[in-house]
Amino acid sequence: MQQIIISGSVAFLVSIFLTPILIRYFTNRQMGQEIREEGLQSHLRKRGTPTMGGIAIIAGITIGYLVTNIYSYFAGYGSFTASGLLVLGLMLGLGATGFADDFIKLYKERNLGLNKTAKLISQLAIALVFGLLVLRFPDENGLTPASTHLSFIRDIDTIDIAFGGGVLGTIVFLIFIYVVVSAWSNAVNITDGLDGLAAGATAFVMGAYTLIAFWQFRNSCDTAVEAGCYTVRDPLDIAVLAAGGLGATLGFLWWNAAPAKIFMGDTGSLALGGLVAGISVVSRTELLMVIIGALFVIEVASVAIQIAVFKTRGKRVFRMAPIHHHFEAVGWAETTVVVRFWLIAIMAVIAGMAVFYGDWLTLAEV
């Protein structure tokens, strides 16, 4: 528990104090967000607001993780783990992609950054490296950071994504990892359209996974093989990362809440999406994340529906997509949309936590 508190606290402090420094830096250099003319007119007032605030989030999570593991080493609790470092690397890689995208937008002074091909190749390369490495580094019990089985609350033994191994199985597994990484990184990116929306929603998810990973640690099959125990390689280090994500997003939210003084940009949204994806893989809860992160799923689904219906029927289901802009277009105030979407995110987290704990209770009683 000490490690979790340290990680969350350090991440929060780094984020909340670094963000205003970034605000001053970008403001003094007149480096601000460009807003599309064809978008909502109410958003034009945000033109020039500093962006790339995700730097503070990434710094908070990274420093919180490093400080915690250095403390753990000297306290005799162990130190860095393969699972934690791989997820951190995934987050940093996608954050770098987002940074390049944001930098190009600011340099060219238009709301278009990396082209789709460059962003796709970057996400693909990062996901493939992550996918190849998560099946390596077995611990003393033979557990690797991830398994080839599809996971809900724990591995589903009857569904082996890699078909037992081989070249074809490896390719299928890597495709699966790419889909997970791409889906969550783009989902958070799409959700980041209103002041505080993505930061708040991600904070709820990270809070849930701090509890989930800590519960997996307390009931690990490594310490006691009993009904309901979890075969997760490094649950405590996963909880440390999730706590860092919680602290960093809350620290950033202090400045990003409406009216936002700074935006996280693609630097932050892609990094946080990578964190969400990575944690779901190494905690072996990919399908559970769909419930806990349901708000992000709704946002992506609204875009997919809008595009599909428009291309097939030439009509629009929503005034604008993603769906948070639809509600703005029909007259909801931005803060109203954000708070109500936060409530949806909270309900999704509660539902996911209930399913997770219910599974443990069911097995523990057997």
Swiss-Prot record:
GO terms for molecular function: metal ion binding; phospho-N-acetylmuramoyl-pentapeptide-transferase activity; UDP-N-acetylmuramoyl-L-alanyl-D-glutamyl-meso-2,6-diaminopimelyl-D-alanyl-D-alanine:undecaprenyl-phosphate transferase activity. It catalyses: UDP-N-acetyl-alpha-D-muramoyl-L-alanyl-gamma-D-glutamyl-meso-2,6-diaminopimeloyl-D-alanyl-D-alanine + di-trans,octa-cis-undecaprenyl phosphate = di-trans,octa-cis-undecaprenyl diphospho-N-acetyl-alpha-D-muramoyl-L-alanyl-D-glutamyl-meso-2,6-diaminopimeloyl-D-alanyl-D-alanine + UMP. GO terms for biological process: cell division; cell wall organization; peptidoglycan biosynthetic process; regulation of cell shape. Its main location: membrane. GO terms for cellular component: plasma membrane. Pfam families: Glycos_transf_4, MraY_sig1. InterPro entries: Glycosyl_transferase_4, PNAcMuramoyl-5peptid_Trfase, PNAcMuramoyl-5peptid_Trfase_CS. The chain crosses the membrane at residues 3-23, 55-75, 80-100, 118-138, 161-181, 197-217, 238-258, 262-282, 290-310, 341-361. Its EC number is 2.7.8.13. Keywords: Cell cycle, Cell division, Cell membrane, Cell shape, Cell wall biogenesis/degradation, Magnesium, Membrane, Metal-binding, Peptidoglycan synthesis, Transferase, Transmembrane, Transmembrane helix. Belongs to the glycosyltransferase 4 family. MraY subfamily. This is Phospho-N-acetylmuramoyl-pentapeptide-transferase.
